[in-house]
Each structure stands twice: as C-alpha cells, then as structure tokens.
Amino acid sequence: RCFTDETKVLLSPDGTVIADLIERSICRIKIGDHVVNKDRTATNKVTFVEEHEPSDKDPDLFSPNENIPPFATTNHPLFVDGEWVAVDVDQYPWLGKQRPLRDANVELINGRRLLNLWVSGDGTYIVNGFGTHSIMYDGGLLKNCYNQGILTHEGVMKIMRFYMDERSDIVTGAFLFGRLMG
C-alpha cells in the first residue's frame, strides 16, 4: 500500500537534481511537485496522491533498518543497497524480483492513515532516505479519469481498494489494463 503520513519525501523545488533538494512529509506533497527518483539521477512529477484512511485490511508497517521506526507497509518495496526489498514480495509481480526481508523492523499499523504517490518517469521516488516505487507509475487510466473529472479522488481510491482488498487475484491484469489504456 503506502507510507505513514510523517514519512519524508525528497523533493526538487525546480524539477532538477542539481537544485538544493528538500525533504517534506508525504502528507504535504501535492500533484505537480517534483520528487527525486531512487537513483538521484532525475526527477519525476507527482501525478496523483493516494490517501488511505485506516482499515482493518491494512498490512503491518516495516523499516529495513532497526534504527528507523517502521514507516512503509510490509508489501511496499524499498530500494536498499542496490536491490528491491519488502517483507511481502508477492503482491506486485510487474515490479520484478524483490528480495524478502526477514529481519525487518515490523510493527502494527495501529489505525494510521497511509499515503502513496503516483509519479511520472521511472515511477520511483525517495522516502526516509530509501528509494521506493509508486507501484502504479503515473496512474495510467485511473489518473486520466481523475484528471478529466470522470472519477473523483474517492472514486479512484474505491477502485484501488476493490482490487487490492477484494480482487487481488486479478490485480496484475487490472494494472496492465490501466497502463495500456492510460
């Protein structure tokens, strides 16, 4: 899913990686902001902000480092030491192979709000010093429907929850359809 709202995102005020970069809480990121990609070689434009209210279906939180409090859901990949890692590596096959973290710092989510960014370019950004993937890239069809007023923000989130919570068996097909049509 996503990240806790106090998670820090690395931003570029002018859309370049040579600018003075700043960190901002993910809950303060807006569509149109430029985030730094996982490799710090380019910026990606934020196209949509996922906001998930607390749910009993939310996964636990993790951090790949025992010195950092857990901030990412266990199924959200992070780019650590040159490879993609997560606690639950089976949910997003279109992202490629991820190494399962067995010694992650894990805790219960305890009803926290979760957020994620959909971004242009390679679909990545940096949270709390680690690369991550938007999972949805720029959002494809769902983003276009939102931008054209066909779907509200809540409508987009309802579709996301349906495929993630109720029909995870076809989430890959739904993702590919959205990319193709977007």
Across the structure, where does each feature detected by a protein language model lie?
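HINT superfamily self-processing domains
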Residues: 1-182
